[in-house]
């Protein structure tokens, strides 16, 4: 049953992504409402997929790459729905939904069988670690989209070619604020994710830090965002610099999440292609 809900939500995310892109092109408000409805129903179906997966498996269903990709996509869509309530940046869905859809399609190609839980994952700290880590990463996805929108808007304003996208994008100040707010929320969550992961590692392997490739790249990503926040607060990094760094930071997030799992050997072998 969980796989059915997963597939249904994937179809709805596809519809939402297409509708959001159509909203940018045709500038019709009803298309935006269609996109939001598809995303909302898809999120509900996705929630049911996670709940039924938990019931079927008997443990927190974020233990392999299929489940991790699905969970990451679910959080991103959830943040989009929250952002739709708290901000007026309706066009954000045109950038976030394709990310979630890509994650879902990647997950769709992976084995979906439920397997016995690896002993290392039988930890009190495991659910907290994954929740904090994925929440932080998803918020950085919002900052990534904000950075892309900032660069697009800045270029169109400089060239004085105000196209369909620019007409829907918020002001540069609003996008810069979105970037900063995402950073101030995402960085503490990433920090908590690393701390809970270290505590979990001590219980699982007897050491808080093992310099595993995943741990090393998590630290690199943390240092990147720490530098961004420091430069923002002390030097006043704003605008274009902040936008570019948010894009670079999220690419580091993706490499830490996917690249390390699939390319580099380490303790996180349970998160590989399986």
Model regions and ranges:
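Polytopic transmembrane helical bundles with strong interfacial aromatic enrichment
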Residues: 1-274
């Amino acid at each position: 049953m969980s796989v059915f809900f997963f597939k249904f939500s994937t179809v709805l995310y596809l519809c939402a992504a297409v509708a959001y892109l159509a909203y940018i092109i045709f500038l019709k408000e009803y298309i935006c409402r269609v996109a939001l409805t598809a995303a909302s129903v898809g999120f509900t179906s996705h929630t049911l997929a996670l709940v039924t997966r938990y019931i079927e498996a008997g443990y927190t269903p974020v233990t392999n790459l299929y489940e991790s990709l699905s969970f990451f996509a679910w959080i991103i869509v959830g943040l989009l729905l929250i952002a739709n309530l708290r901000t007026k940046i309706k066009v954000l869905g045109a950038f976030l939904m394709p990310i979630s859809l890509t994650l879902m399609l990647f997950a769709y190609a992976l084995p979906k069988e439920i397997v016995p839980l690896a002993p290392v994952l039988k930890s009190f700290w495991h659910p907290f670690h994954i929740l904090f880590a994925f929440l932080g990463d998803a918020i950085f996805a919002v900052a990534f989209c904000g950075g892309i929108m900032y660069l697009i808007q800045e270029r169109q304003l400089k060239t004085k070619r105000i196209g369909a996208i620019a007409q829907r994008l918020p002001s540069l100040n609003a996008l810069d604020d979105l970037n900063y707010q995402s950073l101030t929320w995402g960085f503490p969550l990433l920090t908590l994710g690393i701390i809970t992961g270290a505590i979990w590692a001590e219980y699982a392997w007897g050491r808080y830090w093992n310099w595993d490739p995943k741990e090393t790249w998590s630290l690199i990503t943390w240092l990147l965002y720490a530098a961004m926040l420091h430069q923002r607060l002390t030097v006043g990094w704003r605008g274009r610099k902040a936008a570019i760094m948010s894009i670079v930071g999220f690419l580091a997030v993706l490499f830490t999440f996917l690249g390390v799992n699939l390319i580099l050997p380490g303790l996180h072998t349970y998160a590989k292609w399986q």
